[in-house]
C-alpha cells in the first residue's frame, strides 16, 4: 500500500532537495534486475540442457562417420556437420519440410516408436546424380522420386543408419532399420502433432550442392534412456569403449608388423684395429662358444629362445629348444608347434 506523506514531511523533503542534502536519484524506485524466462505451457521442454548437449555430442560423431562413408560411396567431397539440436513439436517439424521431400521412417529397435530422417531435395538429387555417373549437380525441378531413384536412396539411407547405430553405441545398442520412404510429410505421421521431439539439423554439402538433413526423434522414443543422456555417463562410456577399441586395433596392427628373427652363433669383443684388419678367409675364435652349444634366437633385438641349427629340405633352419625369458605359453606353443626333423 502507498504511504501518504504529511504536509510537514513534504516540506522537509523539498527543503532537503533544494539544499542538496538529498538526491533525486534516491527517490526513484529501484528497478528489478531479475531475469524473467518465458515459458510456453503448450510446448513444455522435455529435455534438459545437459541432455541436449549429450545428443549434440552423439550426432557430431554421426556427422563425422557420415562424412567419411558418403565420401567413399559417392567418390566425391562430402561434408556433414551438426548445425543445431532443438526441441519442438512434431507439427512444427512437419510444417517446416518442403513438399516433395525425402522422408525415411526409421524403426529404433529396441526403443519403441519411429524416427524420421529427412533429406533435402537438393541433397537427394545430388546423391542420385553422382551415383548415376553424373557430376553431382542437383535437379532444378521439384518432383517425386522414380522407383529406381527411390531404390537407390534406400541403399544410401541404410548406409547412413549404420552410422546412427555407431554413434549411439555409448548409450544403447541401437538397431535402426528403414521402414519406408515418403515424399509427402503428411504421410509420415509417427506421433501426434503436439508431441515433443528433438530435431538434429545437419548442414550437408555434396560437391558444390548444399542442403540440410534433419533427424527427428520423438521424446517418447528416447524416454526409456533419458537418464543415460548425461555428460558424466557419456564421457565415462566413451573412455571405456575407446580403451577397448584402441587396444583391439593396436593388437591387430601389431600382429602384422614384421620382426627380425636372428639366430646368433656367439659374440666377442674386437678392437677397431683388428676389425679393420679382417680379410676373407680369416678365422675368428669364439672363446665362450663350444661346438654343439645351442644358438641364441633373438626377436626384435631381445633374446627369447635357445635353438638348434640345422636344415629343412634345402633351407637353413633353427629348432627352438627352450625359452630364455618370459614369453607367453601361447606364443611358445605357436613357435614350436610345427617341429620338423633337422639334420646337421
From Swiss-Prot:
<dbReference type="InterPro" id="IPR001543">
    <property type="entry name" value="FliN-like_C"/>
</dbReference>
<dbReference type="InterPro" id="IPR001689">
    <property type="entry name" value="Flag_FliM"/>
</dbReference>
<dbReference type="GO" id="GO:0003774">
    <property type="term" value="F:cytoskeletal motor activity"/>
</dbReference>
<dbReference type="GO" id="GO:0071978">
    <property type="term" value="P:bacterial-type flagellum-dependent swarming motility"/>
</dbReference>
<dbReference type="InterPro" id="IPR036429">
    <property type="entry name" value="SpoA-like_sf"/>
</dbReference>
<dbReference type="GO" id="GO:0009425">
    <property type="term" value="C:bacterial-type flagellum basal body"/>
</dbReference>
<protein>
    <recommendedName>
        <fullName>Flagellar motor switch protein FliM</fullName>
    </recommendedName>
</protein>
<comment type="similarity">
    <text>Belongs to the FliM family.</text>
</comment>
<keyword id="KW-0975">Bacterial flagellum</keyword>
<dbReference type="GO" id="GO:0005886">
    <property type="term" value="C:plasma membrane"/>
</dbReference>
<dbReference type="GO" id="GO:0050918">
    <property type="term" value="P:positive chemotaxis"/>
</dbReference>
<keyword id="KW-0472">Membrane</keyword>
<dbReference type="InterPro" id="IPR028976">
    <property type="entry name" value="CheC-like_sf"/>
</dbReference>
<dbReference type="Pfam" id="PF02154">
    <property type="entry name" value="FliM"/>
</dbReference>
<comment type="function">
    <text>FliM is one of three proteins (FliG, FliN, FliM) that forms the rotor-mounted switch complex (C ring), located at the base of the basal body. This complex interacts with the CheY and CheZ chemotaxis proteins, in addition to contacting components of the motor that determine the direction of flagellar rotation.</text>
</comment>
<keyword id="KW-1003">Cell membrane</keyword>
<dbReference type="Pfam" id="PF01052">
    <property type="entry name" value="FliMN_C"/>
</dbReference>
<keyword id="KW-0997">Cell inner membrane</keyword>
<keyword id="KW-0145">Chemotaxis</keyword>
<keyword id="KW-0283">Flagellar rotation</keyword>
Amino acid at each position: 500500500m502507498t504511504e501518504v506523506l504529511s504536509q510537514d514531511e513534504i516540506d522537509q523533503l523539498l527543503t532537503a532537495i533544494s539544499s542538496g542534502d538529498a538526491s533525486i536519484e534516491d527517490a526513484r524506485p529501484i528497478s528489478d534486475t531479475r531475469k524473467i524466462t518465458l515459458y510456453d505451457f503448450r510446448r513444455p521442454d522435455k529435455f534438459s540442457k545437459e541432455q541436449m548437449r549429450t545428443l549434440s555430442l552423439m550426432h557430431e560423431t554421426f556427422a563425422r562417420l557420415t562424412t567419411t562413408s558418403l565420401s567413399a560411396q559417392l567418390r566425391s567431397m562430402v561434408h556433414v556437420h551438426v548445425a543445431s539440436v532443438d526441441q519442438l513439436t512434431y507439427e512444427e517439424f512437419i510444417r517446416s519440410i518442403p513438399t516433395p521431400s525425402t522422408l525415411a521412417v526409421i524403426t529404433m529397435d529396441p526403443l519403441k516408436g519411429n524416427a524420421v530422417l529427412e533429406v533435402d531435395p537438393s541433397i537427394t538429387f545430388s546423391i542420385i546424380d553422382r551415383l548415376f555417373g553424373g557430376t553431382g549437380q542437383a535437379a532444378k525441378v521439384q518432383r517425386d522420386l522414380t522407383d529406381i531413384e527411390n531404390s537407390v536412396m534406400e541403399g544410401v539411407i541404410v548406409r547412413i543408419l549404420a552410422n546412427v547405430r555407431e554413434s549411439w553405441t555409448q548409450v544403447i545398442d541401437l538397431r535402426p532399420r528403414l521402414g519406408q520412404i515418403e515424399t509427402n510429410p503428411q504421410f509420415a505421421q509417427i506421433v501426434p502433432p503436439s508431441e515433443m521431439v528433438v530435431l538434429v539439423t545437419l548442414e550437408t554439402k555434396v560437391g558444390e550442392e548444399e542442403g540440410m538433413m534433419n533427424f527427428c526423434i520423438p521424446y517418447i522414443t528416447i524416454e526409456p534412456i533419458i537418464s543415460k543422456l548425461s555428460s558424466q555417463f557419456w564421457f565415462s562410456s566413451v573412455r571405456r569403449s575407446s580403451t577397448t577399441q584402441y587396444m583391439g586395433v593396436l593388437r591387430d596392427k601389431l600382429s602384422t608388423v614384421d620382426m627380425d628373427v636372428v639366430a646368433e652363433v656367439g659374440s666377442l669383443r674386437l678392437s677397431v684395429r683388428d676389425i679393420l684388419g679382417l680379410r676373407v678367409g680369416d678365422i675368428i675364435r669364439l672363446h665362450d662358444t663350444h661346438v654343439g652349444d645351442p644358438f641364441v634366437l633373438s626377436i626384435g633385438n631381445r633374446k627369447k629362445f635357445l635353438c638348434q641349427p640345422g636344415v629343412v629340405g634345402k633351407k637353413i633352419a633353427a629348432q627352438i629348444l627352450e625359452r630364455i625369458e618370459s614369453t607367453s605359453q601361447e606364443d611358445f606353443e605357436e613357435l614350436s608347434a610345427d617341429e620338423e626333423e633337422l639334420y646337421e
